[in-house]
Amino acid sequence: MTELNKLTVADSVKGLKNKDFTSKELVNAHIKQIEKYKNLNAYVTETFDLALKQAEEADQNYAQNKARTLEGIPFAVKDLFCTKGIRTTACSNILKNFIPHYESSVTKNIFDKGGVMLGKTNMDEFAMGSTNITSCFGNVISPWKANDDNSDLVPGGSSGGSAAAVSGFMASAALGSDTGGSVRQPASFTGLVGFKPTYGRCSRYGMVSFASSLDQAGIFTRSVLDSSIMLEAMMGFDEKDSTSINAKVPELQSAIGSSMKNMKIGVPLSLGEGGIIEHDIMKMWHDTIELLKNAGAEIVDITLPHAKYGVAVYYVIAPAEAASNLSRYDGVRYGLRVEYENMTLDEMYEMTRSAGFGEEVKRRIMLGTYVLSSNCMDAYYFKAQKVRRLVANDFNNAFTKVNAILLPTAPSAAFKIGEKQNDPTIMYLNDLFTIPASLAGLPCVSVPAGLSARGLPLGMQIIGKQLDEYNVLKVASTIETGVKHIKFEPAGF
C-alpha cells in the first residue's frame, strides 16, 4: 500500500471511509515526515497536539457515520491566516509573538468540514517575495534537486513553506495566499497544483493584508481532483469581508475528466517573445497546446496587448496598498514594541518599524509611500490603476472568443537559493505571467505539465473568466491526464 502521507486528499477520504486506516494513523504519518525533514524549514509553528486531538474527533465521527467532507484530512496553513490561540506572524519580527483571538474565515471553513491542522507554514515576510528568503524564520528549501547539481533550490514564494510541505509529503494539502502569483509560482517550482480562485470567492477575513485589492486565498494539492475538493470547502460568501462575492459555491468535482469538446483555448504566444522564457518552458507550452488539441479543444490565437505592463502596474499598486496596510504596525496596539527611557512617541514608531520590518518589506513601504505622495500620485498610482483596467479589458475581450487561456506559470524552473537575490527587478519578473490574472481578479491554476532538461518541474497556467473555476479545473484535469506518465515527485521522498 502507498505510504499514508503520500495519499491524495481524495484517496485519504476514501481510505478513512473504508476504515483502511484511522485519521490518527494518517496524521502520525505526516508528523513523522515533518520531523524527518525539519531541515527544509517548511513549518514555523507545529500544532501536533491539536492535530492528534482533531484526528481523534474525526475517528469518532467516522465510527458514528457522521463524517464531513474533509473529516480527518491533515492540512497546513500559511502563516498569514489568523488561527485562534495559535501564533500567527506573517513571518515578520514585528508580529513574531502575535496570538490572534479569532479564526480566519477560510481556516474556519476547513475546520467546519473536518480538516486537521498540522501547523503554520513558512512564507516570505508579509507575503512579499518570490523565493521564500525574506522570512524572519529563515529561508525554505525546496524538496526538489536538479539532476546535474545538488545545490539547494528555492521553493518559490511567497507561499514557499506550503509548497514545500505538500511537495515533500508533509501535508495532504496546504493553504496559501496569492497576490501576484504566490500560490501559482511555487506550485510550478515544486510540481504541484496551485489554484487561485476568483477574487472575492474566498473571504479575506482573518488574513494578514498585503495588497487588499489583490490578496486571495489559494490552495496547494498534488492532484486537480484534490484542488476541486479543497476549493469547495474553502469558498463561500462571508459578510465579514466587504469584498466577498455573494455567489453560490459551484460543484467542481464533476469538472475532473470531463470532455474538452466545444472548448476554445486562447493562447497569447506573443507574450513569449523577446527571449524572456527558458527553452524548456517554451517547449512545454507548445507540447501542452498539442495535448489539448488532441483532446478535442480548439486552439485560438489571442493577444493580451497590455499584459506586458502587468509587472510595472503591480509594483505600483501593490506597494501603495502595502504601505497603507502596514501602517497599523506601530508598536502601540499589538506586535513588537521597541522602547527605552525618555523615548518620544515618534521615536518609538521609528525604532519599532525599523527593527520589526525586513529589507524587502521596507523597500516596498518606501516605494508605496513614494507613489502615493502628492507629487507622484497622478504620474504613478492613478496611471497604474488606468492600465490595470486596460489589462482587465484585454481579458474580457479575449473571453468573448475563448473559454480559457493557456500560458506558462513562470518564465523559468526553480533556481538556486541566493542566485537572483541581489537584483530585485530580476526577482520581480518571476511573476511576469501570473500578475495579469491577479490584476483582473480571475480564477487561475498552475498544473504540472513537464520536466526541464535538469529534471525540475514546470507548470502551465490556465486562466478562466470570473467565477468560472469549473472550466479552469476541466482544462487542468485534461493536462494532468495527458502527462500522467511523468512522476512529479522529488527524488528520495
Curated annotation (Swiss-Prot):
InterPro entries (UniProt xref): Amidase, Amidase_CS, Amidase_dom, AS_sf, GatA
Leading EC class: ligase
Keywords: ATP-binding, Ligase, Nucleotide-binding, Protein biosynthesis
Cellular component terms (Gene Ontology): glutamyl-tRNA(Gln) amidotransferase complex
Catalytic reaction(s) noted: L-glutamyl-tRNA(Gln) + L-glutamine + ATP + H2O = L-glutaminyl-tRNA(Gln) + L-glutamate + ADP + phosphate + H(+)
Gene Ontology molecular function: any one: glutaminyl-tRNA synthase (glutamine-hydrolyzing) activity
Lineage top rank: taxon: Bacteria
Active-site residues (renumbered): 78 (charge relay system), 158 (charge relay system), 182 (acyl-ester intermediate)
GO biological process: translation
Catalytic activity, EC: 6.3.5.7
Family, per entry: Belongs to the amidase family. GatA subfamily.
NCBIfam families hit by this protein: gatA (TIGR00132)
Summary of subunit composition and partner proteins: Heterotrimer of A, B and C subunits.
PANTHER family: GLUTAMYL-TRNA(GLN) AMIDOTRANSFERASE SUBUNIT A, TRANSAMIDASE
Function comment: Allows the formation of correctly charged Gln-tRNA(Gln) through the transamidation of misacylated Glu-tRNA(Gln) in organisms which lack glutaminyl-tRNA synthetase. The reaction takes place in the presence of glutamine and ATP through an activated gamma-phospho-Glu-tRNA(Gln).
Protein name: Glutamyl-tRNA(Gln) amidotransferase subunit A
Upper lineage: Bacteria, Pseudomonadati, Pseudomonadota, Alphaproteobacteria, Rickettsiales
